Amino acid sequence: MSKSHAAYIDYALRRTTNMPVEMMGSDVVRLKDYQHFVARVFLGLDSMHSLLLFHETGVGKTMTTVYILKHLKDIYTNWAIILLVKKALIEDPWMNTILRYAPEITKDCIFINYDDQNFRNKFFTNIKTINSKSRICVIIDECHNFISKSLIKEDGKIRPTRSVYNFLSKTIALKNHKMICLSATPIVNSVQEFTMLVNLLRPGSLQHQSLFENKRLVDEKELVSKLGGLCSYIVNNEFSIFDDVEGSASFAKKTVLMRYVNMSKKQEEIYQKAKLAEIKTGISSFRILRRMATTFTFDSFPERQNRDPGEYAQEIATLYNDFKNSLRNREFSKSALDTFKKGELLKGDASAADISLFTELKEKSVKFIDVCLGILASHGKCLVFEPFVNQSGIEILLLYFKVFGISNIEFSSRTKDTRIKAVAEFNQESNTNGECIKTCVFSSSGGEGISFFSINDIFILDMTWNEASLRQIVGRAIRLNSHVLTPPERRYVNVHFIMARLSNGMPTVDEDLFEIIQSKSKEFVQLFRVFKHTSLEWIHANEKDFSPIDNESGWKTLVSRAIDLSSKKNITNKLIEGTNIWYSNSNRLMSINRGFKGVDGRVYDVDGNYLHDMPDNPVIKIHDGKLIYIF
């Protein structure tokens, strides 16, 4: 049915031929062609009630949305605009962009942050105040967070945000309102998020059905056929976060480096104690204590079970202060720092004070030592992602930075009042090479909504639970024209994943999380392909054989058809002759996978999904006694 969708897209574009490509307020900006295209379609089809902007970080989805909001009155007189956003993103980018390019809509805007404990009450209170003659346009920024907060908990409890989700899914189309969802990573943790998002945009279209069988989509064609026009898809980098990507005129080159570091004996000792503590307390599935132990360890492991919280907190504070005091008036000499900046380690002729300090710091954290050495050897500015703030996280890392003489800013929950200004200073043209501020260390607070310019190295100290979060992190530094001020030879970003290892070869929590991420991505890649093939851009570019229409009366019927996956049309069982193989998508063998090569030369993954044909002259490497095909 994509031909039918193409006819409506064509109709919308014909209706909006004269829509200006510039947006003017106190400043003027000219929209990119892809921004103007999606705005014209969404505004040109009044009965297109909802749309997902699946745009990668840095391509201007906020700007696109503000342009749409500015032109809502081209199709109806009275609008109330409700923006559901994270609190940290209200001022920048949303308010700043609106005031700069569309100040006239400010009076119509209602901002509600969905991470507020009273979000549900505030939302419905505001809904009641809206004039009945007004149409509503709802914007959900970083909609994957909103969806996550709307999922029913494993224990069956319904989250407060779910009532807002239900209201929007029932009301938007019924009352002729409009809704735009924005995300660079619309699916983060589970396939259920895809179902939730689809039913928010197209209510009732995807009932409780199993989307996958043996990790393969049951009927991709049915999904694509029924969900045409669901989204706008602007994703220039479709590679895995673990793949290298060549640079272009607008985007910096990305190179991924896996930095494996062997934990010190002290760290291994504390790591094993952390593992036992997780088992005793029943939190081993979260791996929090082990993740912290791979990052930094005090001289002892503070037990938390069956203890007064105040007493436990006091012990942590004492351990922190003891470590901080041990570094008082200590720092590396200029000679040592010059050695580190060359990418070298201390030699035998180094001072006893430098060697002693380095040894003490490494015993407690090989990761922090590795990061500091990497930063000093970097030719430009650096980002460091550390999800933990207190105890063994950023608070400790900053002590290491001080000893190594690394200038820095912090973007975390501890710096809410100063972090936006600090990032602005970090991004200044005068700091392009990191002369004033070398590094920004950020927690999960910095994973969304902010931009960094002229970054050359990103160090990821702790694996997240999903690839989407890693994309958000890396996407902060590789954005459209983010390196325009950087010298041509430094328009690159090295992404360093720092992975801790045990001396006995057993997998660590870092390696466990790496495997979890790869397992999830197999299903997500297929769902992202559905988004791509149902997008306005894909349909407009690939469906040309349609009969033009002169009204939009059939759009609602077209997009209201239920999806039926019961027939499982594309699931076929077939026995194929061939041989088992090992393959990797990286020349550096960052991940090695089991696969299968049929006698016809077709290559499949371990679940039977076709990957591609075997090249005539494949690249093969030998690793641990295995022949590894490089694809």
From Swiss-Prot:
SUPFAM superfamilies membership: P-loop containing nucleoside triphosphate hydrolases
UniProt: ATP binding residues: 55-62
Enzyme's top EC category: hydrolase
GO cellular component: virion component
Domain spans labelled Helicase C-terminal: 367-532
Enzyme Commission number(s) from the entry: 3.6.1.15
All copies of domain Helicase ATP-binding, residue ranges: 42-204
Region Binding to the cap-specific mRNA (nucleoside-2'-O-)-methyltransferase: start-end pairs: 457-524
Domain of life where this protein originates: Viruses
The entry's keywords: ATP-binding, DNA-binding, Hydrolase, Late protein, Nucleotide-binding, Transcription, Virion
Signal peptide: none
Location in or out of the cell: Virion
Listed GO MF terms: ATP binding; DNA binding; ribonucleoside triphosphate phosphatase activity
GO terms for biological process, alphabetical: DNA-templated transcription
Motif DEXH box per UniProt: ranges: 141-144
Keyword DNA-binding assigned: yes
One Pfam family here: SNF2-rel_dom
Listed InterPro entries: Helicase_ATP-bd, Helicase_C-like, NPHI_C, P-loop_NTPase, SNF2_N
Subunit structure: Monomer. Interacts (via C-terminus) with RAP94/OPG109 (via N-terminus). Interacts with the cap-specific mRNA (nucleoside-2'-O-)-methyltransferase OPG102.
Cited PANTHER family: SNF2/RAD54 HELICASE FAMILY
Function according to Swiss-Prot or TrEMBL: DNA-dependent ATPase that acts as a 5' to 3' translocase on single-stranded DNA and thereby plays a role in transcription termination of viral early genes. Uses forward translocation in concert with the viral RNA polymerase RAP94/OPG109 subunit and the capping enzyme/VTF to catalyze release of UUUUUNU-containing nascent RNA from the elongation complex. In addition, acts as a positive elongation factor to assist transcription through problematic sequences.
UniProt similarity note: Belongs to the helicase family. NPH I subfamily.
Official protein name in the record: Nucleoside triphosphatase I
